[in-house]
Amino acid sequence: MAVVKVYDQNKQEAGEITLAPEVFEVEVRPEILHLVVRAQRAAFRAGTHATKTRAFVSGGGLKPWRQKGTGRARAGSIRSPLWRGGAIIFGPQPRDYEFKVNKKVRKLALRMALSSRLAGSNLLVVKGFELPEVKTKLFAKIADTLGLDKALIIAPEENTTLALSVRNIPGITIATPEQLSVYEILKHKQLVLVEGAVASVQDRLK
C-alpha cells in the first residue's frame, strides 16, 4: 500500500495520503497500454480521406483516338490511372477507424497507466490550487515551484479559473476524473492529482 506525501502549491508538505494498491500498484503490461492507446487514437480519426476511382472521376467516356493507325499507344479513356488527371486505383476511401476494446481492459489499462506514473516517481499529489483570479503568470509560477514541465493535472471538478489560467501554458493539461484517459496520462511526463480527486479516481477504477 503506497503512502504518498501531499504538498501545497508552494511545495511544502501538507500531509500524507494512502493510495489503493489495486489502482496504483498494478503490474504494467505494455501490450495492454498499446492496445488501448491505439483504440483511443483511432477513435479520434475523422476518416474523411477520399480519392476518385474510375466510377467517380469526371470525363473520359469517349475513346481519345481510334485504336489503330495513329502510331500512338492505344488508349480507351483520358481518365485511365496511367494518365495525369486520371483515376486512382485502390486509393483511400472514407471509413471509420474505431474499434472496440472491452470495458474491463480499458479500466485495467487506466490502472496500469496510473501505476507506471507512481512507480516512475512521476506522480505528485497536491492539496489544491488557490487562484484568486484568472492569471496565467500566477499559475506559471506555481508550476515552476512544483517542478511541472509536461504535466496532466486531475482536478476533482471543472474549475474555470484554473482551466483558463492553465490553457496558455504549453505542455500542461487539466482534466477531471471522468475525463481520465490512458493516452493523456502516457502523453504527459508527470501526473498531478489534486487531493480531492484521488477518491473519485479510485472509486471509478476499483
From Swiss-Prot:
Q: Which HAMAP family match?
A: Ribosomal_uL4_B
Q: Which GO terms describe its cellular component?
A: ribonucleoprotein complex; ribosome
Question: What is a biological process (GO) this protein takes part in?
Answer: translation
Chain's role: One of the primary rRNA binding proteins, this protein initially binds near the 5'-end of the 23S rRNA. It is important during the early stages of 50S assembly. It makes multiple contacts with different domains of the 23S rRNA in the assembled 50S subunit and ribosome.
Any keyword Ribonucleoprotein?
yes
Q: Which family does it belong to?
A: Belongs to the universal ribosomal protein uL4 family.
A Pfam cross-reference name: Ribosomal_L4
Q: Which gene encodes it?
A: rplD
Q: What is this protein called?
A: Large ribosomal subunit protein uL4
